Amino acid sequence: MSDDEYGDIDAAVWDEAEALTQASQTLPSNFPHRRKRRRIGSEELDDGFLSGRRRGSHGFSRSDNDEADEKKSKYRIHLGAEEVPAAVIMGATQADEMPDSSPYRIRGPIYKRPRRSPPMELEQKSSPAQPSMVESAKTQKQNIVHSPQPTAQYDFSRELEDLPSDAFSPSPPQLRMSSIPITISSSPPLESTQSVRSQRLAAPQNGLRQTTLFGGRAPNQVPSSTQAKKVHKYLVDKVPEPPTHHTLDEEAIKTWIYPNNLGAERRYQYTIVHKGLFNNLLVALPTGLGKTFIAATIMLNFFRWTTDSQIVFMAPTKPLVSQQVKACFEIAGIPRSSTTMLTGDQSPALRAEEWAEKRVFFMTPQTVENDLKTGIADPKKIALIVVDEAHRATGNYAYTKVVQFLRRFNESFRVLALTATPGSSVEAVQEVIDNLEIAEVEIRTEDSIDIKEYVHRRDITEILIDPSDEIIMIRELFSKALQPLVNLLCSQKAYYNKDPMGLTQYGMLTARKAWMASGAGKSAQMSIKGMMNALFTVLTSMGHAIKLLNFHGIGPFFSNIKDFRAEVEGNKKGGKYKNQIVNSPEFKKMMERIQGWINKEDFIGHPKLTYLCDTVLNHFLDAGAGLMGDNMPPSSTRVIVFTEYRDSAEDIARVLNKHGPMIRASVFVGQSDSKRSEGMNQEKQLETIRKFKAGGINVIVATSIGEEGLDIGEVDLIVCYDSSSSPIRMLQRMGRTGRKRAGKIVLLLMRGKEEDSYKKSKDNYEQIQRMISSGSRFTFRHDLSARIIPRKVKPEVDKRFIEIPLENTQDPSLPEPKRRAKPRKKLAKKFHMPDGVETGFRKASKLNSNAESPLTKFGIKRKPSELNDDELAPVPLLDSVLLNAKDEAEHSRRFLKVPDGALEEVGMPDLTAQPITQRTLTRTAKVSHGKYTRSCVSLFNKLSRLQRPEDRDNKPYGDEPPSDFGSIPTMPLEAEVRARAPKAPKASDPAQVVKASRVAKTTSALKKAPASKRVAPKKAKPRRGRALRNDNSDSEDSTASMAMVSNLRSSQIPQPTPDSDEEGPGERVDRTSDMEELEADDDSDLGSLVDFIDPTQTQTQIPLTGTSNFSSSPPLMETWEDERINGNAVGGRRGMLPRAVEMTGAKNSSFKNGTMTQESSDGGDSMDSDFPTIEDLVRSDTTTTTTRKIADPPSSSVFSSGQKATPNMFTRKRDGDVRGRGLKRRVVESDDSDE
């Protein structure tokens, strides 16, 4: 087609056609720039849109006139071997693509990169009619929108004439098998004529999370395996649940009760109650919509379903606990006798009794936690736990710890969480869900359809306030006082805001933490660190004062600063920077001005107080104008003012009470005391609420204690004196009004920061409510929500009017337990052991028996192992059993030898090796003997007294041969005792001479006398005995022993007759002062002299003078030489005496009238000459020795004159003094009373 066919078209018409077709125009990349359109001839038009193909590149036909008139271009255009696809213009302007764009925006062509055409899909079955390549090319060419310039159609068939006819036919089946997708499936393939696409395999998506560019969650996200399980809708798909351990009432679980006591049924309450019976549920409802009713109904049904399980209701404050108690009594009708209210005021013993008897408990979470940890409460018996104000269940709060403790021992319990605001962020709400093991959420907002009819209108008014002139003046003075400290802090690059009025507590704490973690803080010297810590501490406290000044008034600010000044001036150690602030002239000027203003009665420290008084007065005036009814007094309405600090609350109440009696204001604060005011205990809080409901008080100025959960009556006006960035607190405040009728909320906001904080809180609340309602951003714990009721049981609802028990209406007081006159026995401690655990010990002989096996009660018995008698046990090699030389050396080195050569042989510990020490309290330095040590010593002494005399020196169990004390010959004292001769017996009669017990002489005595003189005498002489002294004993005896010895020397005590069975008192062995604490009757009778005399002889008793105490110590065994008197041996064997006779220091001694007497003389031979020397003892062939067992090494001693020998007596050494110190010495007891 030639160009002459369009030569008669007018230019205007062509422009219109060009505009209509330009939106989808295709421009090849090799086109030259458009030339200015001009008219060539009378019927020809040249517009510059000449295709390159028409220039002869592809053989297009052209007329001869055009070739003649065309001028050669001076630019050479290079054409590539392959044609580059041209860019596609979607529209000439943005208005074509985006018609809604603004007209002032820059418009231009929008280029879109052409996409590659998708490959042709091969059909599995060839169709009978296949289009040829030429027809496809023609069809594709028709789809392309050409330019208005007509072009000639090119016939491609000329270029394809040489190709075979089957070049474009489908390939054979055996050649195109690879292109057909292979599907592997367990089900047979479907017969279909359509092409089957291969299934796209998805990679595992565990732990992945797809989000949008703006941080939102992408739709259709596959939950990871770590998240909670999906909600199964069919019973066959659900995981089997183990049966509960709680005892259920089979008849009661068939129905569940919904009370109709409060009037018409609310559908949302019914839905929430039904879901809360079978799932761990989080209920988020605006205040005043019946959360208390929902909790009471669920508690009632679990009280019916279980027979002995327990139900716990927890609330953070005591007023909230008492509020729920009344709801359960008046709505659910739970018997009062089965309920109790426990707090920290009751003793643990009283709470333990309540846990053992009652079933329903109203408690604070801290008390529940303590009772569970101490074993007072049994976690396995709890079936339902109700958590009020559940948004507190974050971090380490008591709610979290209680649920965690229950989960350790109890897998079957229900959790019901109640709150008005679940959290201030998505993370906080998720933490509450995880800590309380929530599986379902029921949330309603004020815009929800099913609660709109029960929510009254709330008018919210925001009042923006500017600071007063007084506040601006105080800011300037206080800023100048703090400016040097702020500059010093900024110089260290720890803080960057040089305006002191911008200080906040949070900002200071954050800056301090950041500086300490930075490199400058870590590398700083200790002096710099101390300076920075002091600066941060002072400015943090000043940040709180600035907040009081800006948002609460001059009064609270002055109270805080006055305490700061008193602390610095009073202690005189306030620190350098505190003194710098207090002593600055600006600070002093500021305090003087504030003091002058405070002294005025009509002074108002903040413009908020002015607006507050106007708002409250207008509200009461409007109420009196008839808004509350014609018969209602003006003060019948109620107002609550919320503030953050107690000082501010007291200032507000003071200003409001100036407008009495119309306004009767009272503060409502917590229980803790502050520096300037005391708190309100539970009784005062309840009394204030009662007066507020009754009308005695019509305005309450409350802190955060009044924000959560309290039902403080019908409130028509809420005034928020300060704003909070927490949406939870703001919503709790606003929920106090609009319950029974329309309410009004007034917000007093300072321009700037407080205004922005409120807007942030409002937006945050709305966003969180939408997220919780959708549930797409949270993960729920369906795996921990047990149904408790068997799945085969489907309880039916029973809507009825609950009859309140008579006991619930008679006593209006709270069910607090009273202290009993006589406390009961303390309950046994519970150790929270798992069920079925085997306590105590098992004998090794019964390990294989089935009698005590835990599985025996289930009918499972252990199969006894049968031994094959025919099979012999393998006999090991002898070398593998016995020890070789190397093993024996190792055994001797490790087990038989000890280093240092102390003891070569190591034996078993012998408890009888030190009997004296076991029966004696040894010396102590700083720590005295304990109760059990004294008891053991007393026990050993008593056992010693009960032992037979002849076995007292024998080791038990036959470790040593019995002693030969019974074979000692009769003492020659018997004849003299019977004769009672007035004169001393003759020395020639050896039978009448009593040989005193001998011991080794001292070294000095042995050196004095020569060896020739130290021989056995031919004539018996009265001699004094030698006593033993214990070197290791205490040098100073006890006071009791010294007094006893002194009495013996100064007086003569009558002695019993010889025929009497009475034995004289002996001396008490007292090695330390601790022995005085033993019992007075610890005296032991270890035997007498008669016990060692031949039993064939007539036994007599030696009456001795003096007094003594019975000794509880074992006898000391001495080595004696056989004595021969006048050539006649007293005994043919050694004489072994268990105790040494104590004699006084007399030179001659004899027995007169059955009593041993002593004569003192200054002259005479040395009495030491009568004793054998050590050489004589060594040379004696007939002398036999016995091992001497004594606790301490012996030493020499002397006798004191003028004292008669007494049994079991110790005396102390004295040189030449009759009244000297006595030496402790053991003597032979001459009493056969033990026989």
From Swiss-Prot:
<keyword id="KW-0378">Hydrolase</keyword>
<keyword id="KW-0227">DNA damage</keyword>
<dbReference type="InterPro" id="IPR006935">
    <property type="entry name" value="Helicase/UvrB_N"/>
</dbReference>
<dbReference type="InterPro" id="IPR039686">
    <property type="entry name" value="FANCM/Mph1-like_ID"/>
</dbReference>
<dbReference type="GO" id="GO:0005524">
    <property type="term" value="F:ATP binding"/>
</dbReference>
<dbReference type="GO" id="GO:0005634">
    <property type="term" value="C:nucleus"/>
</dbReference>
<feature type="compositionally biased region" description="Basic and acidic residues">
    <location>
        <begin position="61"/>
        <end position="72"/>
    </location>
</feature>
<feature type="compositionally biased region" description="Acidic residues">
    <location>
        <begin position="1075"/>
        <end position="1085"/>
    </location>
</feature>
<feature type="compositionally biased region" description="Basic and acidic residues">
    <location>
        <begin position="1065"/>
        <end position="1074"/>
    </location>
</feature>
<keyword id="KW-0547">Nucleotide-binding</keyword>
<dbReference type="GO" id="GO:0043138">
    <property type="term" value="F:3'-5' DNA helicase activity"/>
</dbReference>
<dbReference type="InterPro" id="IPR014001">
    <property type="entry name" value="Helicase_ATP-bd"/>
</dbReference>
<feature type="compositionally biased region" description="Polar residues">
    <location>
        <begin position="1194"/>
        <end position="1209"/>
    </location>
</feature>
<feature type="domain" description="Helicase C-terminal">
    <location>
        <begin position="608"/>
        <end position="784"/>
    </location>
</feature>
<feature type="region of interest" description="Disordered">
    <location>
        <begin position="1144"/>
        <end position="1235"/>
    </location>
</feature>
<dbReference type="InterPro" id="IPR002464">
    <property type="entry name" value="DNA/RNA_helicase_DEAH_CS"/>
</dbReference>
<feature type="region of interest" description="Disordered">
    <location>
        <begin position="808"/>
        <end position="827"/>
    </location>
</feature>
<keyword id="KW-0234">DNA repair</keyword>
<dbReference type="Pfam" id="PF00271">
    <property type="entry name" value="Helicase_C"/>
</dbReference>
<feature type="compositionally biased region" description="Low complexity">
    <location>
        <begin position="1160"/>
        <end position="1170"/>
    </location>
</feature>
<feature type="compositionally biased region" description="Basic residues">
    <location>
        <begin position="1015"/>
        <end position="1027"/>
    </location>
</feature>
<dbReference type="InterPro" id="IPR001650">
    <property type="entry name" value="Helicase_C-like"/>
</dbReference>
<feature type="region of interest" description="Disordered">
    <location>
        <begin position="20"/>
        <end position="78"/>
    </location>
</feature>
<protein>
    <recommendedName>
        <fullName>ATP-dependent DNA helicase mph1</fullName>
        <ecNumber>3.6.4.12</ecNumber>
    </recommendedName>
</protein>
<feature type="binding site">
    <location>
        <begin position="285"/>
        <end position="292"/>
    </location>
    <ligand>
        <name>ATP</name>
    </ligand>
</feature>
<feature type="region of interest" description="Disordered">
    <location>
        <begin position="944"/>
        <end position="1117"/>
    </location>
</feature>
<dbReference type="GO" id="GO:0045003">
    <property type="term" value="P:double-strand break repair via synthesis-dependent strand annealing"/>
</dbReference>
<dbReference type="GO" id="GO:0009378">
    <property type="term" value="F:four-way junction helicase activity"/>
</dbReference>
<dbReference type="InterPro" id="IPR027417">
    <property type="entry name" value="P-loop_NTPase"/>
</dbReference>
<comment type="subunit">
    <text>Interacts with the MHF histone-fold complex to form the FANCM-MHF complex.</text>
</comment>
<feature type="short sequence motif" description="DEAH box">
    <location>
        <begin position="388"/>
        <end position="391"/>
    </location>
</feature>
<keyword id="KW-0238">DNA-binding</keyword>
<feature type="domain" description="Helicase ATP-binding">
    <location>
        <begin position="272"/>
        <end position="440"/>
    </location>
</feature>
<dbReference type="GO" id="GO:0016887">
    <property type="term" value="F:ATP hydrolysis activity"/>
</dbReference>
<feature type="compositionally biased region" description="Polar residues">
    <location>
        <begin position="1095"/>
        <end position="1114"/>
    </location>
</feature>
<feature type="compositionally biased region" description="Polar residues">
    <location>
        <begin position="1146"/>
        <end position="1159"/>
    </location>
</feature>
<feature type="compositionally biased region" description="Polar residues">
    <location>
        <begin position="137"/>
        <end position="148"/>
    </location>
</feature>
<dbReference type="GO" id="GO:0000400">
    <property type="term" value="F:four-way junction DNA binding"/>
</dbReference>
<dbReference type="Pfam" id="PF04851">
    <property type="entry name" value="ResIII"/>
</dbReference>
<feature type="region of interest" description="Disordered">
    <location>
        <begin position="96"/>
        <end position="148"/>
    </location>
</feature>
<keyword id="KW-0539">Nucleus</keyword>
<comment type="function">
    <text>ATP-dependent DNA helicase involved in DNA damage repair by homologous recombination and in genome maintenance. Capable of unwinding D-loops. Plays a role in limiting crossover recombinants during mitotic DNA double-strand break (DSB) repair. Component of a FANCM-MHF complex which promotes gene conversion at blocked replication forks, probably by reversal of the stalled fork.</text>
</comment>
